From Swiss-Prot:
Gene that encodes it: recF
Protein name: DNA replication and repair protein RecF
UniProt binding sites for ATP: 30-37
GO biological process: DNA replication; DNA synthesis involved in DNA repair; double-strand break repair; SOS response
Main location: cytoplasm
TM ranges: none
Organism: Stenotrophomonas maltophilia (strain R551-3)
Family: Belongs to the RecF family.
Subcellular location: Cytoplasm
Coiled-coil stretches noted in the UniProt entry, renumbered to this chain: none
Superkingdom, natural source: Bacteria
GO cellular component assignments: cytoplasm
Length: 364
């Protein structure tokens, strides 16, 4: 997957700018606040439907403007297939959005996000390891969404049933109606959990190997799924029935895949609460790169890799290891920094851009 053109309109500091990145590594430098991160933010918004720095309506649209617009043109380069040029556009006001993909309107944002895959490492990525369960569930589901075509319909089926059951619990609905939605939750939730389990097992092998190469001092040894109920003791249908009275009192569903989580086990660190911020960042990066490698194996092409403010997130040794690993493969990479990272100073085969005064200038 190679981005050929990125155009931004009314996004944060930018009025209208355009970037024509190259295959391989693209380095964007500039002072703090110049807008480097906003470029990666635009890619992330197209790939995930949200920014990694908050909601669209919280400052992403340029002040005084009604909506932002993003246009991306890229080549799909799957194995044994010739490159295929694709185009996507998004207009977002913070409340409403309109998207187009390959010349056609899209009815659901998920359809737009399914087209462009971006794996992003940014200053908040440590939350993947040290934060709450929601980002970890999203991490699993994003990967499955891209490598298993029917996963989205399964996830939507579960989400709809959960919404209906929660509404009934709040309204004090009759047991016969709860029986119906318990059955639907179990029918979708059991296979959804099996997918998550198998995916995490696959990622575990890659994450352990990557961490041993990039940050051997971490001693990552395993990744373990907590499915959201005592799955080793009883099926989800029984867990929902047993929790029904408690759920009636609480007004929401307390067991199921929406309560799932996963953790990383270390040789010499007792758990995530004992991790330093630096250790959490390195662990998160290993997980993200493992996800990118798995995507590449399953789909036959690499996702775009975006590394925001790499020099301030990792020390020089770890920067060098990460960049050496990535530069040895075919991925298109975007790196932002206030100045050229030491690991890149001697390289000549990278594309360089400077961001200043809300403009992007290619550096010869």
């Amino acid at each position: 997957m190679q981005i050929r053109r990125l155009a931004l309109h009314q996004l944060r500091r930018f009025n209208a700018v355009e970037l024509s990145p190259q295959p391989g590594l693209n380095l964007l430098t500039g002072d703090n606040g110049a807008g480097k991160t906003s470029i990666l933010e635009a890619l992330h918004l197209m790939a995930y439907g949200r920014s990694f720095r908050g909601r669209v309506r919280d400052g992403l649209v340029r002040q005084g403007q009604e909506a932002l617009e993003i246009f991306v043109e890229w080549d799909e380069q799957r194995a044994s297939h010739p490159p295929h040029r694709r185009k996507a556009g998004l207009r977002h006001s913070g409340q409403d959005w309109k998207g187009r993909l390959d010349g056609e309107d899209v009815a659901q944002l998920g359809n737009l996000c399914a087209a462009l895959a971006v794996v992003t490492f940014e200053p908040g990525s440590h939350a993947l390891v040290s934060g709450g369960g929601e980002p970890r569930r999203r991490f699993l589901d994003w990967g499955l969404f891209h490598v298993e075509p029917d996963f989205l319909s399964l996830w939507r089926r579960y989400s709809r049933a959960l919404k209906q059951r929660n509404a009934l619990l709040k309204q004090g609905g009759p047991s016969r109606m709860l029986d119906t939605w318990d059955h639907e939750l179990a029918e979708a939730g059991e296979p959804l959990t099996s997918r998550r389990q198998h995916y995490l097992e696959r990622l575990q092998q890659r994450t352990v190997a990557l961490a041993a190469e990039l940050a051997p001092q971490l001693g990552i040894q395993a990744m373990e799924l907590s499915p959201g109920w005592r799955r080793h003791e009883l099926p989800l249908a029984d867990a929902l029935l047993l929790a029904r009275e408690r759920d009636r009192q609480a007004g929401y569903t307390s067991v199921g895949p929406h309560r799932a989580d996963w953790s990383v086990d270390f040789h010499n660190i007792p758990g995530r609460d004992a991790l330093s911020r630096g250790q959490a960042k390195l662990t998160a990066l290993a997980c993200l790169l493992a996800q990118a490698e798995d995507y590449a194996e399953q789909r036959g092409e690499w996702p775009v890799i975006a590394l925001d403010d790499l020099a301030s997130e990792l020390d020089r040794t770890h920067q060098a290891r990460v960049l050496e690993r990535l530069l040895g493969g075919p991925a298109q990479i975007f790196v932002t920094a206030t100045e050229t990272p030491a690991a890149l100073q001697e390289l000549t085969h990278i594309a360089r851009f400077h961001v200043e005064h809300a403009q992007i200038v290619a550096v010869p």
